[in-house]
């Protein structure tokens, strides 16, 4: 029925033409009032090429432009001269002014064109909003796609009840979608991508039952995907890329049986199972990327006969690839990248010529590994197999982390790549290697020197171009001197619609500076349609997210301007990994329809240490002869004697080199110069393993120097752990390790210098002058910063670490009072995430969790307990171990529980704040702190849950209603006090008798035996 009026219109139009009523005689000119309206419109839009010497309805002059060079350009006015009586005037029914660089505000005078039904002003630079005068118009099709309109959703549009197609894509509208949009019941197409709309989707959208095409990608909506989408039973296309909504995808989606194109990506919320899509038999494009989908891939996916593009990448899918996938004969693209799929890779995936990507998975069937190299396989299988330490056949590029099989003498220590372009020599010493492979939909390319590689995933959909380009040439004006050696690096770039990963292969282990070179060379800064585009993507280094929603133009403050992002990276397994991923943000219709994903111009990797030098012994003998050989032998004898005398002093050097650590960034001479030979006036603290000094390098950079005490071998080993593992951890809330110095038995770590010392000094320093006046917002920021740092250590980093000594003095504050966790010298690796027994208790009285201090049970929940104590100190401004309101209380924590039982927790808030704090936030933070100090580790929250609670993403009410989170069993309090006052006062270290193991269940058993769960 919705198309009957169109059919009727066509029949009438044909009849009128047949009877000669559309001829342009003198009596069939455009109505004079509409001519005046067009003149006003043209003046406001700067449309100077309209020739009013010709009648706008004559089809002559500039009123209909049939030849143009710009893609998407259109300049046409369509009239209807069939109105009765026969000699009446013509009227404008359609105006299309597309891609014409029009500027200014939207003219209200369009409302004077009473018969206008179609208005297309897409891809211009119009500003402001929609005039209220438009409320009386009878528009059916309206497009402002790709302009600069702003403000809230124009309510005047909800008055245009005849609208069938509405596009506001690619503008700057903000705020919620008004409920009045439900009045547009005739809408068939609604395009709202690439704006800044917020709030939940109004349920009134469910009234738009005639929708066939709905797009809301690249916005900031909140809440879940609503169930009312099941009302859109006629919908053919539904796109929700990076729109801010949470999962799960509702089961009601199964009723949308007409869908041919479903695209959803980057959902928030909790993981959920695969949505029921079996009824979507007409589906051609199915994209469910990064939607937190867990579990197996349903078998019926392979039976969807019309499916051409399938993208299930970057989810949590597990199990084997269904055998039904062999039936997907018509599929052009299959992306299963970045999941946890196991089993084997089917032969039909490896052998087919279509684009298939199963990289970054956990396949275990060794027999399905191709016998030849990754770049000779049609499909992309990079890092797709998880075989552990098992022997394997074929190339190592198929294995996770690409293990290096070359001896040390062949390791690489510098790397330069000109991404998307040819070889560029910037000086005598540095040449950027060519990276100009044109293909890229699903590929692996090995560099010319076989020491770097790239993996690309994704095809440029919707651009109507069969020959997608994955390397691009500069189209903007470069702000780089053409005579500059680096000019050639920014003339080209490599792009990818979805995922782009670069590898440094067989690098020597150690600390490196990685420079990523960017310049936006597609979008421009002028008023052309190329200035309307927006590119956003995420940057990962060593699989860790380092920049979210990176915008090259914004970072460089313009197009064509170079910007270099530098990262200190510790390579520990000979592989460097740099990942760029599109996260559904940015424009997809400007300047032309398509995806504008990651872009990179060049990569440089340089060591922060002196690489070892290896010589070919045969060549030396041939060139220098026997005399030199004799001298060399004598030298070896002398060195041998010298080594024998000093072998005890070099034990740590040997230990470090045995671990293949190359972190000798600083010399002892540099360190002594920076610290005035460790002058006592430079001393700023005393750590668990030695003193800490403030230093200043020759270039003026401030550093913190930690000089390791040589009192014990245990300390030496901990130092090795710090160098080898902690420098690989980079997070805004962790103290950054710059490098180390290893000379003889001098073991020194060099950290970033933090201006505001530690949290304990800021809160309760010895004298008032050393304390900082921390307002409430700063305390909350510190609270959240510590929580985020621990979340990273426990859950997000590649190597899981339990700190074991979280306390206020191990939290440092930078110049902006951001919290950074320090002192990982006591950290223990927890690779498999299981509970384990520690044979050495390391921690501080008053901060240690009972199960760890008493039994040696160590999990990340020990850090959670310590965090809870520090959290109380942040809110109260009092030290847990030094504050005793009466003799009945040993710790601040005990007093906190008493106040909680009395219902007067807010008495804990630091009195120096007076009333300048949020009572609601204080109650939340205090209750979270007490939850963290629950005597039972199984009842403590994880640190990610703490972050979610404080950020308001998770409600607190249900947890607070559980007595186990809000009260303390007297038996537990007595047990804890007894332990602190007696057992810990004797010793902080003990050995367990014989080998012991523990699991989550045994931990609970232990709690029951000690009365922790009574």
Swiss-Prot record:
Domain Protein kinase: 678-960
Residues passing through the membrane, by range: 620-640
Keyword entries, A-Z: ATP-binding, Glycoprotein, Kinase, Leucine-rich repeat, Membrane, Nucleotide-binding, Phosphoprotein, Receptor, Repeat, Serine/threonine-protein kinase, Signal, Transferase, Transmembrane, Transmembrane helix
SMART domains in the cross-refs: LRR_TYP (SM00369), S_TKc (SM00220)
Subcellular location: Membrane
Modified residues (Phosphothreonine): 667, 839, 844
Membrane topology: Single-pass type I membrane protein
Extracellular side: 24-619
Entry EC no(s): 2.7.11.1
UniProt signal peptide: 1-23
Modified residues (Phosphoserine): 809, 838, 989
Domain of life: Eukaryota
UniProt xrefs under Gene3D superfamilies: Galactose-binding lectin, Phosphorylase Kinase, domain 1, Ribonuclease Inhibitor, Transferase(Phosphotransferase) domain 1
A GO-annotated cellular component: membrane
Record-linked Pfam families: LRR_1, LRR_8, Malectin, PK_Tyr_Ser-Thr
CDD domains in the record: STKc_IRAK
Glycosylation sites per record: 76, 87, 101, 165, 210, 220, 231, 362, 389, 474, 481, 511, 570
Cytoplasmic topology ranges: 641-1014
PTM annotation (Phosphotyrosine): residues: 751, 852
Region feature Disordered, mapped onto this chain: 989-1014
Family matches, as InterPro entries: Kinase-like_dom_sf, Leu-rich_rpt, Leu-rich_rpt_typical-subtyp, LRR_dom_sf, LRR_Rcpt-Like_S/T_Kinase, Malectin_dom, Prot_kinase_dom, Protein_kinase_ATP_BS
Catalytic activity: L-seryl-[protein] + ATP = O-phospho-L-seryl-[protein] + ADP + H(+); L-threonyl-[protein] + ATP = O-phospho-L-threonyl-[protein] + ADP + H(+)
Protein residues bound to ATP: 684-692, 706
Family the UniProt entry places it in: Belongs to the protein kinase superfamily. Ser/Thr protein kinase family.
PANTHER family registered for this protein in UniProt: LEUCINE-RICH REPEAT-CONTAINING PROTEIN DDB_G0281931-RELATED (PTHR48006), PROTEIN KINASE DOMAIN-CONTAINING PROTEIN (PTHR48006:SF68)
Protein name: Probable LRR receptor-like serine/threonine-protein kinase At1g07650
